[in-house]
Structures are given as structure tokens and as C-alpha cells.
Regions:
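ABC ATPase nucleotide-binding domains
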Residues: 17-19, 23-170
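ABC ATPase NBD Q-loop/coupling interface
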Residues: 1-16, 46-51
């Protein structure tokens, strides 16, 4: 483990200058907010003027000025979380470690604190390692994501890298809401054309992957299509023509579940409207079909 080029592997934890905040706030119940925030600095015998300066600056940044004389029992969940953050940040750490810090918050408060955390991190410029099982938190907050499974790194990169260019089926399925549509298809060469036969559903191979699929004729592949990459087409003239099975209104659009020859696909449609039982046609956005090996589940196409 290195920090700014210095090997910290065998440095005692208390000397690494890493601040940590966990799902449980672990505030001292008998201390005020002010005392909770200043305690670590006091134990290091920092000058009183410096302690006051740091606590005042951090409480102002986190909106805690009016809460400094209260105890944890008098605070809401969101306020306690901000106190825990403030207590860590006043130390001026080199690295900030957050382990599922929003796990105890309700959905509305989680959105608010997520926004505040991102703003604070950007303002302070502290390298932050944020551990979460929530892909929405990872996608909305991270500059760089490391996606792990069973202790192994599956892929790392920017949020867009993982969303638009997943290197395997696991990554493609984990990132994105609703989950990516997955179809196991057999690659067939028919009268000079390359087709994807998925049970009763048959698709013409998109131009950008035809050459690649020629190598897999007679074999199975898995195609992945994100709901947001399906667009409406004139009725009966789409690559996917089916009947609406279910609709989830979102206000500014809707999720539509389309039964296409026995395969149910979900599409994320902006604007417009549709009803259950109606015929609907969809196209896949050009260059947006993801191909995976049916055995290794690794990505086949580079795009």
C-alpha cells in the first residue's frame, strides 16, 4: 500500500493518516457535536486555536453550526452522518475511507447526503475510497470504479467504461437499471446473411458485428441490449416487434416490457405513452448491441 509514493504497508494504522466513516456512525453519545468533532485533535494535543479553527470551518461546510451543542441522541440520521464525516475530516487526512456510509439512511436522505458527499470531496480534493454494494452510488459518485466479485477485480474504469463497454456479462448485468436484456442466440448463416436465432425470435446481425459473428456461425453467443438503447420504431417495421406485456410509468417516460416471440425485453422510453396489449416496435441503437461468449461470458465485440 503506497500513499503519494511512500510505502505504507507496514506503517501502524494510527500513523497512516487515513480517516474512516462506516455505516454505523459510532459517535460518542455523552459528547456534544463539537466535542465529537474535536476529540481526535485533542488527543493529538493540537493547539486549541487550531482545533477551534478546524471545527468551525468543517461545521460550517457541513451545515452543523446550529447543532454544535447538541448530543447525538438529539440528531436525525442525516445529521449524525454529517457529524461522523466532520469528525473524520477535521483531521485533514491524506485518504478518506467510506464503508457504506449511507446504508442506514432512507432513500430521500440518501440522495441528499450523496450529493453533499460528492460536493465535499470535490472541494477538499481528498483521495476517497468509497465501498458500496449500491451500483447507483458507485455510478453517480465515482471518478474511477473497481467492480469486484468474490474478492476478484472484474473490471475497473470510469462509470461510462463499465456501462458502455462492460468486459463480461457479470459487469453488464450488475451496472445499469433496469438490468440489461440478455438473450442466448445461435449464430446462423442464411443466404449470405448472418442471423441471430434466439428460440422463436430471429434477429438480423447488425452491420458493425457481422464480420465478427461469421467466426461464430453454428455456435451460441449471448447478446446484451440495454433498456435505454432500445428506441421506438414505426409499428411493424422494427427489429423487435411485439406486444406490450407491462408498463411502469416514470413521469418523464416509462419502462415497457415487450413480449417478442416469447422473449420479454424491457425498454426505457422517454416521453410518449403506451398500454398493455398494444403492438409496439423497437430498434436497437446503432452500435449498441453487446456480444458475449456463451461459455466464458467474456465480451466479444470491442465497440
Amino acid at each position: 500500500v503506497s500513499d503519494k509514493g511512500k510505502d505504507k504497508t507496514f506503517v501502524p494504522p494510527q500513523e497512516r493518516n487515513i480517516a474512516m466513516v462506516f455505516q454505523e456512525y459510532a459517535l460518542y453519545p455523552n459528547m456534544t457535536v463539537r466535542k465529537n468533532m474535536s476529540f481526535a485533535l485533542e488527543t493529538k494535543k493540537a493547539p486549541k486555536a487550531e482545533i477551534e479553527k478546524r471545527v468551525t470551518a468543517m461545521s460550517s461546510m457541513l451545515g452543523l453550526d446550529e447543532l454544535l451543542d447538541r448530543r447525538p441522541a438529539q440528531l436525525s440520521g442525516g445529521q449524525r452522518q454529517r457529524v461522523a464525516l466532520g469528525r473524520a475530516l477535521v483531521r485533514d487526512p491524506q485518504v478518506f475511507l467510506l464503508d457504506e456510509p449511507l446504508g442506514n439512511l432512507d432513500a430521500k436522505l440518501r440522495d441528499q447526503v450523496r450529493y453533499e458527499l460528492k460536493k465535499i470531496q470535490t472541494k477538499l480534493g481528498i483521495t476517497t475510497v468509497y465501498v458500496t454494494h449500491d451500483q447507483t452510488e458507485a455510478m453517480t459518485m465515482a471518478d474511477h470504479i473497481v467492480l469486484m466479485k468474490d474478492g476478484h477485480i472484474m473490471q475497473q474504469g470510469t462509470p461510462d467504461d463499465l456501462y458502455s463497454h462492460p468486459n463480461c456479462l457479470f459487469v453488464a448485468s450488475f451496472v445499469g437499471t433496469p438490468q440489461i436484456n440478455k438473450l442466448k442466440c445461435k449464430v446462423v448463416a442464411e443466404e449470405g446473411a448472418i442471423k441471430l436465432v434466439c428460440d422463436q425470435l430471429t434477429l438480423n446481425a447488425p452491420d458493425d458485428v457481422k464480420e465478427l459473428l461469421k467466426l461464430y456461425v453454428g455456435k451460441e453467443v449471448i447478446i446484451g441490449i440495454r433498456p435505454s438503447e432500445l428506441v421506438m420504431a414505426p409499428e411493424g417495421q422494427g427489429e423487435l416487434n411485439g406486444v406490450v406485456d407491462s408498463v411502469e410509468p416514470l413521469g418523464d417516460g416509462f419502462h415497457v416490457y415487450l413480449n417478442v416471440d416469447g422473449q420479454v425485453l424491457v425498454a426505457k422510453i422517454a416521453g410518449g405513452s403506451t398500454v398493455i396489449g398494444k403492438s409496439l416496435s423497437l430498434n436497437v441503437e446503432k452500435g449498441k448491441m453487446h456480444l458475449f461468449d456463451s461459455v466464458t461470458e467474456e465480451r466479444l465485440n470491442v465497440g
